[in-house]
Amino acid sequence: MGIKGLTKLLADNAPKAMKEQKFESYFGRRIAVDASMSIYQFLIVVGRTGMETLTNEAGEVTSHLQGMFNRTIRLLEAGIKPVYVFDGKPPDLKKQELAKRYSKREDATKELTEAVEEGDKDAIEKFSKRTVKVTKQHNEECKRLLRLMGVPVVEAPCEAEAECAALCINDMVYAVASEDMDSLTFGAPRFLRHLMDPSSKKIPVMEFEVAKVLEELELTMDQFIDLCILSGCDYCDSIKGIGGQTALKLIRQHGSIESILENINKDRYQIPEDWPYQEARRLFKEPNVTLDIPELKWNAPDEEGLVQFLVKENGFNQDRVTKAIEKIKFAKNKSSQGRLESFFKPVVSTSVPLKRKDTSEKPTKAVANKKTKGAGGKKK
């Protein structure tokens, strides 16, 4: 789920913290990618028609491999250096959210069965997507594919979004790419949406800067974390009746969840029983991450390994895979130039921030202070 309604909240209240960027703007940049979110998108979109998906001869789904292969090649061709980060064990506080997701998939499965019996194509399309789940096998197959492509893989001890943010905070990558906004709450200095969009539409990349988010919202990082918890996150329920705009107003007025709880109208707003907001806050401020990872390297592709895995084991077209390998090799040579050309021909965003209402209040700048395990990182 991520942070409920955060994109719209920022568009309405912190437009200067958001800017559209071209794909090519990130030439030579290391980008940490939330792998599970990308795989989920590929399973939903790539090669899907109703209940039909891409499969190999054994009937195993290959949409995630097709999507990961093609999208990663596009990143490499643009000179981007992706680092895919995979989820580890979820925190205990997330079990309730995972149980909700399981229940929703069960309901969708029942609805899908009825839609199939009725021959309702639109309903089949809708409910089949809601039954999608990223499995351990999907993750392991994508890790194998990426390593064969010469692309670095990081296995997070816990949440991938937190690990991505830690890599960015410690200058091991330039930005974090995902569709869920959690990485901003974990303090990632730069966050990118739509970089991994698998649709055929050319959607511009949306870049967020956490420092500008805080400045525009006139909040400290601690207050921003409380805002995200109030808006709705994966770690606990939110207060019924309080959405993003109300949460922002309350945080600006009272400064913290504790102060809000002391002053809120409890007849109007129902506080969740045994609400673990303090533990949720701790998970955002002190996530379980590691920087003790192998040096990030983008190696030459294992051509024989890719043919074996994609063509022989998963039924991919031999000619297409061979041509794709050539693209990877060419892209690697191109990216070895680094960002030297930026000294002569910088890529500048042509977007104009959305307008917002004038405010007479003086914004307060704040800097995220995150705790991570391990030592410092490499230059991004």
From Swiss-Prot:
Subcellular location: Nucleus, Nucleolus; Nucleus, Nucleoplasm; Mitochondrion
Signal peptide range: none
Alphabetical list of SMART domains matching this protein: 53EXOc (SM00475), HhH2 (SM00279), XPGI (SM00484), XPGN (SM00485)
Keywords: DNA damage, DNA repair, DNA replication, Endonuclease, Exonuclease, Hydrolase, Magnesium, Metal-binding, Mitochondrion, Nuclease, Nucleus, Phosphoprotein
Regions of compositional bias (Basic residues) in chain numbering: 368-380
Region (Interaction with PCNA): 336-344
PANTHER family, per the entry: FLAP ENDONUCLEASE 1, FLAP ENDONUCLEASE FAMILY MEMBER
Name assigned to this protein: Flap endonuclease 1-A
Organism: Oryza sativa subsp. indica (Rice)
